[in-house]
Amino acid sequence: MRIAVIGAMEEEVRILRDKLEQAETETVAGCEFTKGQLAGHEVILLKSGIGKVNAAMSTTILLEKYKPEKVINTGSAGGFHHSLNVGDVVISTEVRHHDVDVTAFNYEYGQVPGMPPGFKADEALVALAEKCMQAEENIQVVKGMIATGDSFMSDPNRVAAIRDKFENLYAVEMEAAAVAQVCHQYEVPFVIIRALSDIAGKESNVSFDQFLDQAALHSTNFIVKVLEELK
């Protein structure tokens, strides 16, 4: 099976890239694509760059040029739910934009005109990730909503405002909704799997710098388990 894995930063893709066999890397429009073999699958690893525009552009190139059957977006995120800690892993059930507001025209907050309010992750991929999470003993793995915006959520006031908009939000980051929207348009199944590098609003910038590598390791190890179970 041809599976695409997307991470925004070098720290988020380095470990998985090192695990690929027969790896070949090429750069298209500034985006790094590495093809290789892992767990019996052909894997295309994309380093997309940070933010929604980079994520949307690179995911479009990915789907047009490499035509993966499924897409997994991995990396770090900021935790939003009160039950979460740094290092925990969140599996998306749904992804939304948290910085889109066209409510003046009767759209839901976060809804892009012409798009659904949220983008549902593939149920089979979520179920598979759930199966893998049962084997995790040292970290908490949960599933829920992830929201995306082009900002790092270190301001407690902004965090509170987003919480008011999305009651059941588990994590925030800067690429997933763009990846999900492109996959939705191309009708390619996707899931977002993110490990928490910080808890949004609580000295997030300090925590992010300290725990990014830990988050990358947790998310990569979990991705490998999913690939091993994927048939």
Curated annotation (Swiss-Prot):
This is 5'-methylthioadenosine/S-adenosylhomocysteine nucleosidase. The gene is mtnN. HAMAP family: Salvage_MtnN. Catalyzes the irreversible cleavage of the glycosidic bond in both 5'-methylthioadenosine (MTA) and S-adenosylhomocysteine (SAH/AdoHcy) to adenine and the corresponding thioribose, 5'-methylthioribose and S-ribosylhomocysteine, respectively. Also cleaves 5'-deoxyadenosine, a toxic by-product of radical S-adenosylmethionine (SAM) enzymes, into 5-deoxyribose and adenine. It catalyses: S-adenosyl-L-homocysteine + H2O = S-(5-deoxy-D-ribos-5-yl)-L-homocysteine + adenine; S-methyl-5'-thioadenosine + H2O = 5-(methylsulfanyl)-D-ribose + adenine; 5'-deoxyadenosine + H2O = 5-deoxy-D-ribose + adenine. Its EC number is 3.2.2.9. Pathway: Amino-acid biosynthesis; L-methionine biosynthesis via salvage pathway; S-methyl-5-thio-alpha-D-ribose 1-phosphate from S-methyl-5'-thioadenosine (hydrolase route): step 1/2. It comes from the Bacteria. Substrate binds at residues 78, 153, 174-175. The active site is at 12 (proton acceptor), 198 (proton donor). Signal peptide: none annotated. InterPro entries: MTA_SAH_Nsdase (IPR010049), Nucleoside_phosphorylase_d (IPR000845), Nucleoside_phosphorylase_sf (IPR035994). Keywords: Amino-acid biosynthesis, Hydrolase, Methionine biosynthesis. The keyword Amino-acid biosynthesis applies. One of its GO terms (cellular component) is cytosol. One of its GO terms (molecular function) is methylthioadenosine nucleosidase activity. GO terms for biological process: L-methionine salvage from methylthioadenosine; L-methionine salvage from S-adenosylmethionine; nucleoside catabolic process. Pfam families: PNP_UDP_1. Belongs to the PNP/UDP phosphorylase family. MtnN subfamily.
